[in-house]
Amino acid sequence: GINFSNKSYNHMVYGLTVVEIINKISFDNNPCEIIFRLVKKTLEKMNVSDNYLIKIYYLFFQLQLLIYIGFQPSFFKCFKCKTKLNVGSFCIEIGHMVCLKCSTKKIISIEKKGLDYIRFLMTTHIDNIYQNIPDNKKCLNSINNVLNKFILYHISELKKCKLFTNELENELI
């Protein structure tokens, strides 16, 4: 079972945030087996991980959940001109990644290393995540920032999610 009693504050916050996200987006009396397995496995992994890895499992959870509920982010091509992204700028007006040429603000939201790690998290089984852990906190924070903006744009229910919105105010790492 899951036991956060002897763990850190981060274990509890991230675990409860996962549960609160599911609570806000789930429909009553409409269980989804695949999302249940995602939540269960994520919480189990968080329970036995150090603080750094917990946050990576949290990013994994968010990406996989978006895929399962039909909001798979397109982080690898510009939403406007469809060119492959080497760096991306999150366009808050349309809720998607764009290239710097199409960006109105010309601000890089995420570097290539971050895009590559998103691809890894989207295509890797949760049991294999430990094999590729970036040591770059800036990279993880940029992924977290872009994911949070994407989620809040596309899933408005999470604006009412206190833990999720509080987590936005702080850096991931």
Residue map of PLM features:
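Non-catalytic alpha-helical scaffolds and adjoining flexible linkers that form interface surfaces
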Residues: 1-173
